[in-house]
Amino acid sequence: MTQPVSRRRVLAASAGAAGLLWTPASRAACPEPLDFPAGVDHHRQNYRNWAGELRADDVWTAVPGTADDVVTLANWAHRQGYALRAQGFRHGWSPLTVTAGTDCASRVVLVDTRRLDAMTLTGPGPEPGSATVRVGAGAGMEALLGFLEDAGHGLTATPAPGDLSVGGVLAIDAHGTAVPAEGEVRAPGTTYGSLSNLVLRLTAVVWDPGAGAYAARSFERSDPQCAALLANLGRAFVTEVTLLAGPLARLRCVSRVDVPAAELFAAPGAGGRTFDSFLAATGRVEAIWFPFTERPWLKVWSVSPERPVTSRPVTGPYNYPFSDTVPSPVADLAGRILGGQIQLAPALGRAQYTATVAGLTATASADLWGAAKNLQLYVRPTTLHVHANGYAVRVPRSGVQEVVHGFAAFYTARLRAYAARGRFPVNGAVEIRVTGLDDPAETAIGGAQAPALSALCPDPSHPAGEVAVWLDVLTLPGTPNSGAFFREVERYLFAAHPGTRVEWSKGWAYTGEGAWSDPDVLDRVVPASFGPGWDAAVSALDRLDPARVFTNPFLDRLLR
């Protein structure tokens, strides 16, 4: 008999041996910033990103209660030469908030946004049946989706974790998984693109040239300057947004663990149970493929107003408890890998697959039905904290199977080649999802701007009807040779699919040393993937924050 063990506890215990845990610096060595605004709560805090790879010691953190407090902080920072970095739930990987080594001496103040969490339904949306909701940037996605559900509304797709702030989600054009199924008509007030495409208006703290100071200003979706703010990478400070919402949908989610990867990711035209066949049938698919295993965990969502006879009804989110706790042999394998026994990666992959199959049966969660958010949210904060790379491959809808087939073949071949040399750079899953692009026409607002820096921003030079295949590869932090392996994956995707863009919140620009370090990707490849819209967006962000209050060294390097 095995005893469930928290995967977070496994990672924490193992990461200590790998040097990934850290302790606070001496608090006495960090004086309070000069003339800090009275009335704004603040304290010193240690920062770490989701995987624990980026951390900042003993940094001053402000906790504004209102948008006016953010304005006050911005003008103070401008006078004193500080940078402000908004933070929500810290469920991200890339150095968009702070860079490695940031500390008290760096003249950086983190701004905890979670008191900016008010929500109000503001009326019907532009399309019959849609609604609008005004929400603070610090509100959590789980809270927002619950608020909408109580009012009879929801979203077509959303990121799987509920512990994400609305502002953070919009800053990096966060997404779920959804394209129109065959014959499906888009519901009013919804999008198949990123959540940034749901914004009708937003309020940001920007420079007011007339007043010679920072001030809160509202931007309508039709304002050309709004294009750069819709997915701003943290280079701006949004305090509030008004979003579209659609009618509340009921979803069914069927999990399958019986389709071989060779069949699911077969060459286009092969027939059978291909990834594309499931996508055509329901429009909502996710594949989770553990390394060195033959059958992915395939989730297939479908719109289902009435409960199918075989489906178990659910009334809350997070219905896969086995994703948060694992049998002790699996926990032991993860710990031993982090302790240096990297050759156990194949055993860990097989153990994770076995735990998934057993968990789906034991919890009767292979066929679920309920309100949309209860099927869309399925990643708890207690899940295993791993490093993840991320890319969006933009292709015509007819090209999805070609993308997943080519990627699966390349990934498998390289994984085997590394293993033949005694190297095991990947010990986590591959995750594959598909979305539409950010079509501003879905807002039903005349002159609506597309999110200029969204990975899903349409490219006028590409054909209409494109979708994005999102590809992530996961591995435990600090796994040897992972940087080199991810560099090969990245180069393959950019070479094989010119429409590839990076997923801002995750790992990219790899060298053998790790992520966010390849100068060619940072300086040339990423900007080129956005075409002329890149320079226009960067210029707009610079105009709105000429004193560079809302930036960090990584963003200064990237957005230039």
Residue ranges of each PLM-predicted region?
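Structural signature of FAD isoalloxazine-binding scaffolds in flavoprotein oxidoreductases
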Residues: 94-118, 176-209, 237-241
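Conserved glycine-rich FAD pyrophosphate-binding loop
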Residues: 102, 367-560
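C-terminal segment of N-terminal export signals and the immediately downstream linker at the start
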Residues: 3, 22-53
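N-terminal secretory signal peptides and thylakoid transit peptides that target proteins
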Residues: 1-18
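Short secondary-structure capping/junction motifs at helix and strand boundaries
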Residues: 83-85, 152-160, 212-217, 251, ...
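C-terminal substrate-binding/cap subdomain adjacent to the FAD-binding core in PCMH-type
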Residues: 199-412, 416-428, 433-434
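Glycine-rich N-terminal segment of FAD-binding domains in flavoprotein oxidoreductases
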Residues: 52-157, 287
